[in-house]
Amino acid sequence: MEEAVESPEVKEFEYFSDAVFIPKDGNTLSVGVIKRIETAVKEGEVVKVVSIVKEIIQNVSRNKIKIAVTGDSGNGMSSFINALRLIGHEEKDSAPTGVVRTTQKPTCYFSSHFPYVELWDLPGLGATAQSVESYLEEMQISIYDLIIIVASEQFSLNHVKLAITMQRMRKRFYVVWTKLDRDLSTSTFPEPQLLQSIQRNIRDSLQKEKVKEHPMFLVSVFKPESHDFPKLRETLQKDLPVIKYHGLVETLYQVCEKTVNERVESIKKSIDEDNLHTEFGISDPGNAIEIRKAFQKTFGLDDISLHLVALEMKNKHFNTSMESQETQRYQQDDWVLARLYRTGTRVGSIGFDYMKCCFTSHHSRCKQQKDILDETAAKAKEVLLKILRLSIPHP
């Protein structure tokens, strides 16, 4: 059964980053959880990262996705919501419709076709002299995950302003043209030509304001199984996981990236101080292969760690040896650095040539060590991002 509820009080939100809002009463991305991820990344415990991310994803999977339906008054937003839910206007839990303004405040509807989704019917824009900016502020548009901009008869300046604001806020949005049945019944053009004309008009209006192209659907609320309605439902079903987890993945990656960068800066200080032996137990600072293996282990990219990640994620893509990658290149280049190192510290070397060789040796050694470190850190970020993306459930 479809359900409708009156607009509840909006929960307080704690702003954590540009990517995601965190409910104050929730623990999905609490400070403690973030610290656990930072510690795991810093210590190279990639398997622990997988475990923590799984916990977070499981918690988020129970969260509702908030979809706001908005547009000018009279565009048929309530009728569109009923058609999207595949219920008639006369049914008990349908959104009220009529020629007068029927939606006075944000109202939430549910549908068995879209579990874990809240469809919010917002009051139409344009019934008063209220600006788009004040309207969006009053509707608290920032709390919604997806905005559906509904238009009919004309794609007005208000619709364009809505799209501009959504792009500026980095909000995902769809454009839906309703009342297509009326257009088809009154137009003298063939149907394909009329559809192209409507699409071109919307696209041109948005392109003039440098709004990137977003999904666009032409529908008739009286034919919820025809025109672009099936395509709209299919697109929405595919987008729901992305909508639900995109901000979360972005935020988690920012945490991981920041932690990796901090670890890199710390190791570079050890390189400058010629202290890799103490910190990593490296016996030969001129041995590029030994250094690379030590750095890979530090970031959890050694074969054993990646094998454990593959088992934990049940994904064979992580079960490939990284220790064997680029080995041949380092074996070819390593003798040059090693020879410089040995020559620079040879007891028999004296005077200016000795000092010059020592400087050259130290400079070359530090440069190669930092190059290896940067390559390993970049690979660590790739692996962490892959873990986050592959952790997202798909329908």
Swiss-Prot record:
Ligand binding (GTP): 72-79, 97-101, 179-181
Disruption phenotype: Mice are highly susceptible to T.gondii infection, due to impaired ability to mediate clearance of acute protozoan infections. They also display strongly increased activation of the Casp11-dependent inflammatory responses when exposed to extracellular lipopolysaccharide (LPS), bacterial outer membrane vesicles or Gram-negative bacteria. Mice lacking Irgm1, Irgm2 and Igtp/Irgm3 (panIrgm mice) show resistance against M.tuberculosis one month post-infection; then, panIrgm mice display higher bacterial burden and altered cytokine during late stage of infection, leading to increased mortality.
Keyword GTP-binding on entry: yes
Result after altering residue 358 to A: Abolished localization to parasitophorous vacuole membranes or Golgi apparatus
Modification comment: Ubiquitinated; polyubiquitinated in the cytosol, promoting Gbp1 recruitment to the T.gondii parasitophorous vacuole membranes.
IRG-type G domain span: 63-239
Classification via PANTHER family: IMMUNITY-RELATED GTPASE FAMILY M PROTEIN 2-RELATED, INTERFERON-INDUCIBLE GTPASE
Protein name (Swiss-Prot/TrEMBL): Immunity-related GTPase family M protein 2
Organism this protein belongs to: Mus musculus (Mouse)
